[in-house]
Every structure is written in C-alpha cells, then in structure tokens.
Amino acid sequence: TMSTSTIAHYIHGAWHSPSASDATPLLHAINGEVIAHVGNEAMDFESILTYGRTVGNTNLRRLTFQQRGLMLKRLALHLLKHKEAFYEASWATGATRSDAWIDIEGGIGNLFSYASLRRQFGDQPFALDGDYIPLGKQGTFGAQHILTPKEGVVVHINAYNFPVWGMLEKVAVNWLA
C-alpha cells in the first residue's frame, strides 16, 4: 500500500510543503484511502516567474547542448530507477499497469530520445544556422547566423491522460533548446 506523503512544490530554488491547515487530501481512486496531501494556498506567481526568468533561465542558457542533453539523460536514468513508484502512484489513480506503461516508460524513453539529440549539436550554448556567407569582395568579412536559447519562461499545461509522458516531453524539448 502507498504511504501518505505531502506533495511539495519546488519554488525559488527550494522545496516548499503546504502547512497542515492548507493541505488537501488526495484519495486513492479504488479504495478511497488518503494517499497524499497537496497544498491549496495561494502562490505568488509573479515572483515565481521572475525567479524563473532571472535565475533558472540564466543558468540554463549558460549550458551547452551537450550539458543539457546529458542532464536529460541523467534525469531519465534516475526516473527509470524509480519507475515502480510511478506504477504504484498510477495504480492509485485507477490505471492498470499496462495503461501506465506507455505513459511512464514512454515518457522516460522520450527523455532519452531528446538527450540523444545533443549529438547533432556542438558543445556550445548556441547552434550554427546555415553556412558562413562571405560579404566583402576580398572575403575579408562575412556573416554567420546562430540560434540562441530564448530568454523567459515556459508555462506548461498538461493533460491528465498522460501525466508523466506529457510533462517529460514538454520539459525535455525546452531544456534542450
């Protein structure tokens, strides 16, 4: 049987758990037992977005494609080690193991796929776009387009039918790019 846990949020670089008075119970879909508690307190989304823009985005943009891809691979390996806990949580939502398989292992496989895309890029935080274009008669100067990571944050809204795959697919593409 699942243990009762409190689901925390990672905000401003730290884990935050709801207070007991703000915690809402989550119930097992089959037997109705409390399996976890989540917070329902108001969050300061403006400060969360500011932190994401100034700290999270800044640090992520410093990483090269190789570093970002390897980060995705490490995350996939970590999640794979803990996949049985995901199956247990999925069972509590009413899903069978075969229902959950495509979501859990497909989502982790998606991380591995995006991690492998790093091989298509150099070991720098930008990508070359096209060839060098000589612009002067003597070839003394020219142009080269580059693709750089966008500044800002991404807000993901995920469907309930694939909670693992949906989230991992969305974050993988943005962390790599």
Indicate where each model-derived feature is located.
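Conserved small-residue-rich beta-alpha loop and adjacent elements
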Residues: 126-177
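N-terminal Rossmann-like NAD(P)+-binding subdomain of aldehyde/semialdehyde dehydrogenases
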Residues: 2-139
